[in-house]
Curated annotation (Swiss-Prot):
Keywords: Calcium, Disulfide bond, Lectin, Metal-binding, Secreted. Its main location: secreted. It comes from Crotalus ruber ruber. Ca(2+) binds at Q96, D98, E104, N119, D120. This is C-type Lectin CRL.
Amino acid sequence: NNCPLDWLPMNGLCYKIFNQLKTWEDAEMFCRKYKPGCHLASFHLYGESLEIAEYISDYHKGQDNVWIGLWDKKKDFSWEWTDRSCIDYLNWNKNQPDHYKNKEFCVELVSLSGYRLWNDQVCESKDAFLCQCKF
């Protein structure tokens, strides 16, 4: 694998948790500026969720939820990944997504679920975040 030392290699891509708190959009922009082709992380298999959850539990400083690259751009429960990969796997927390008060359109990993399950959240909330890159 060609991933830098503190990145997690998985299925040909590299993943890294960033502990600074950013809004969803600022986090996606940070990932994109880090290196061309980088985005907030996308998930396609249950096994990836478990491996990422373990990695975040090991390396994340703090109890913050963690942004991933899923969002509801059209605000109608039609979810999209920022890397434009296909939506072939979802792992929502119980009773989610709910677009609570019609304000939640960005997706985070829930720290209380051990970073395994997903919640839709207000995009202006500040979370830690997970970038995905190809090196």
